[in-house]
Amino acid sequence: MTNTEIIATMSRCVCGTRIRWTQNQDNNMHRGVVDEFYPQNGAEDAYLAVIEPERYIPVLSASEIQKISILEDQHHNA
């Protein structure tokens, strides 16, 4: 995926959106729930705050992601 495609997918995420992604440094598929999306801001890359089953990832930047997809288009009310 291109960086533009990754950011476009990230921008569709809201709190509770379930996603899966592959990071550049590994080939493992990760799954988690989005906590918040932060758009690109000047020199700062767009990023997501994500909750995985075993950990919280406060910054998952677009440049770290190789491939991302939304598992569902609905979000869950917390």
Named regions from a protein language model:
Residues 1-18:
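Mixed-charge, Lys/Arg-rich low-complexity intrinsically disordered regions
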Residues 3, 48-78:
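Intrinsically disordered, low-complexity, charged/polar segments
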Residues 5, 20-22, 69:
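Residue-level detector of intrinsically disordered/flexible regions characterized by low predicted structural confidence
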Residues 11, 29, 74-75:
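Intrinsically disordered, low-complexity cationic segments
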Residues 12-15, 39, 70:
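Generic surface-pattern signal
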Residues 18, 22-62:
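Basic/aromatic-rich interaction segments and small domains that mediate binding to polyanionic partners
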